[in-house]
C-alpha cells in the first residue's frame, strides 16, 4: 500500500501544525493511504504520528516500562497500540486499538495480557503535555513537559488495576538528536522514534488478577511508529535501557532488511548528555554465551546476555554488560527480558544496576 510522507502531505502538515490538538480513533482501520511524520514538530513529541489513522500496514505504539531496583524479578510494561494487522505482527484483536500489559512478579513468573479498546481511543496534546485514553480497555496515560507520566488501568474484565508513575532523570531525544524542532525522527528506513523519557524514576502499584505488583525502580517511555510492516524493515534488533550509577543508557543496534546495520546511542551523566548519535558503531551490541549467533534468526532462543560498547570519541569508551534473568515475552520473533546490568568507562569506576532489553528476530536462520 502506498505511503505518502510528511513533505508531500499537505493534510498531515496542516493537521499537526498547531501546538494543541485532539484526535478520536475508531476501532477500525483506515481504508486508504496513511501519512507518516518524519520530522519533529514543536511540542508534539507524544502526538500521533500517522494521519488520519493507521491502515493495514502501518503502526504506532506508546510504550512505558518499569524495572524494579528493590527486588530482583519484578517488572511491568504497558503498550498502547494502534496497529494494522500486518504492521507489527502482534496478535490482532479484531481492530487496531489494544493495550498490551506484560511483566514479571517477584518469584519470576511472567505474564502477558492483551485487551482491545473496542470503544476507540482519544488523544489530546499541547504545550508539551499529552493524554491518551484507550476506551473499552480501561486504560489511559497522561504526561506533562516530558517530565512526568502516569499510566492508569482499571479493567475488571481482565482483572488489572493500578498506576505507574515515571519522573524523568534524562532529557527527551530523537534517534540521532536531542529534542528540538525539525529533527529527523527516523531510526531505520520506515521506522521512527520519539523518546520522551530515556530514563526515569518509576513507582508501580498494580494488582494483576489479585496478585500484587508494587515496586520502585527505573523506567522508560517512547513513541514508535512505522510506515511499513515491521518485519519488512527489520532482520534483527537489539534495544534496551538501563542505569549505572549516575549514567543513563539507551541502545539500538538494528540489522535492516537492506543488509545495513543501524545504531542509536544515548548516554547521560546526572541528566547531562554526553553521547547522542547514530554514527557507525556508536553503540555496538552483541550477544554472548548460549545462543549468541549474530544476527539472530526467527526461532533463536534468547542469549545469556549482551555486551555493549559505546564510542564517545577521543578514545573514550563506555563498556556495559547485560545478563539475562527473566524472559517476560519469549516467542520465535520477540524476546522481552530483564536482567543485571554492569559497566562504566574503560579504566574508570564500574557500576551495577538493572536493565530492560528487547531482541527482535524476523530473518531466516
From Swiss-Prot:
Pfam family membership, one: DA_N
Pathway field: Secondary metabolite biosynthesis; Alkaloid biosynthesis; Mycotoxin biosynthesis
Cited SUPFAM superfamilies: AttH-like
One Gene Ontology molecular-function label: lyase activity
Broad class of enzyme this protein falls into: lyase
Catalysed conversion reaction: (1'E,3'E)-5-(3,3-dimethyloxiran-2-yl)-3-methylhexa-1,3-dienyl-quinolinone B = aspoquinolone A; (1'E,3'E)-5-(3,3-dimethyloxiran-2-yl)-3-methylhexa-1,3-dienyl-quinolinone B = aspoquinolone B
Keywords in alphabetical order: Copper, Lyase, Metal-binding
Annotated EC: 4.2.-.-
Function: Quinolone epoxide rearrangement protein; part of the gene cluster that mediates the biosynthesis of the aspoquinolone mycotoxins. Within the pathway, asqO catalyzes an enzymatic 3-exo-tet cyclization to yield the cyclopropyl-THF ring system in aspoquinolone. The first step of the pathway is catalyzed by the nonribosomal peptide synthetase asqK that condenses anthranilic acid and O-methyl-L-tyrosine to produce 4'-methoxycyclopeptin. 4'-methoxycyclopeptin is then converted to 4'-methoxydehydrocyclopeptin by the ketoglutarate-dependent dioxygenase asqJ.
Family of this protein: Belongs to the quinolone epoxide rearrangement protein penF family.
Name recorded for this polypeptide: Quinolone epoxide rearrangement protein asqO
Native species: Emericella nidulans (strain FGSC A4 / ATCC 38163 / CBS 112.46 / NRRL 194 / M139) (Aspergillus nidulans)
Amino acid at each position: 500500500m502506498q505511503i505518502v510522507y510528511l513533505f508531500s502531505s499537505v493534510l498531515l502538515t496542516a493537521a499537526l501544525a498547531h501546538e494543541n490538538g485532539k484526535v478520536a480513533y475508531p476501532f477500525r482501520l483506515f481504508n486508504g493511504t496513511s501519512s507518516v511524520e518524519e520530522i519533529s514538530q514543536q511540542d508534539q513529541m507524544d502526538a500521533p504520528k500517522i494521519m488520519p489513522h493507521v491502515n493495514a500496514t502501518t503502526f504506532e505504539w506508546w510504550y512505558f516500562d518499569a524495572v524494579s531496583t528493590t527486588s530482583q524479578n519484578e517488572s511491568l510494561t504497558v503498550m498502547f497500540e494502534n496497529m494494522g494487522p500486518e504492521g507489527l505482527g502482534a496478535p490482532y484483536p479484531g481492530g487496531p486499538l489494544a493495550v498490551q500489559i506484560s511483566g514479571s512478579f517477584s518469584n519470576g513468573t511472567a505474564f502477558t495480557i492483551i485487551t482491545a479498546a473496542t470503544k476507540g481511543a482519544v488523544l489530546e496534546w499541547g504545550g508539551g503535555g499529552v493524554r491518551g485514553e484507550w476506551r473499552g480497555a480501561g486504560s489511559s496515560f497522561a504526561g506533562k513537559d516530558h517530565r512526568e507520566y502516569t499510566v492508569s488501568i482499571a479493567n475488571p474484565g481482565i482483572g488489572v488495576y493500578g498506576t505507574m508513575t515515571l519522573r524523568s532523570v534524562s532529557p527527551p531525544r530523537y534517534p540521532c538528536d536531542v529534542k528540538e524542532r525539525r529533527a529527523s525522527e527516523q531510526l531505520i528506513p520506515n521506522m521512527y522514534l520519539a523518546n520522551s523519557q530515556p530514563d526515569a524514576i518509576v513507582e508501580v502499584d498494580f494488582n494483576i488478577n489479585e496478585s500484587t505488583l508494587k515496586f520502585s525502580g527505573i523506567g522508560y517511555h517512547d513513541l514508535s511508529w512505522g510506515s511499513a510492516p515491521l518485519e519488512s524493515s527489520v532482520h534483527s534488533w537489539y534495544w534496551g535501557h538501563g542505569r549505572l550509577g549516575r549514567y543513563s543508557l539507551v541502545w539500538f543496534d538494528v540489522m535492516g532488511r537492506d543488509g545495513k546495520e543501524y545504531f542509536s546511542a544515548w548516554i547521560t551523566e546526572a541528566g547531562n548528555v554526553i553521547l547522542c548519535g547514530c554514527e557507525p558503531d556508536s553503540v555496538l551490541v552483541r550477544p554472548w554465551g548460549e545462543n549468541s549467533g549474530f544476527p539472530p534468526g526467527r526461532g533463536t532462543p534468547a542469549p545469556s546476555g549482551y555486551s555493549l560498547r559505546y564510542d564517545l570519541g577521543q578514545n573514550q569508551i563506555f563498556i556495559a554488560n547485560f545478563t539475562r534473568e527473566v524472559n517476560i515475552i519469549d516467542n520465535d520473533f520477540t524476546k522481552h527480558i530483564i536482567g543485571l546490568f554492569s559497566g562504566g568507562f574503560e579504566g574508570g569506576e564500574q557500576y551495577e544496576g538493572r536493565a530492560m532489553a528487547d531482541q527482535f528476530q524476523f530473518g531466516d536462520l
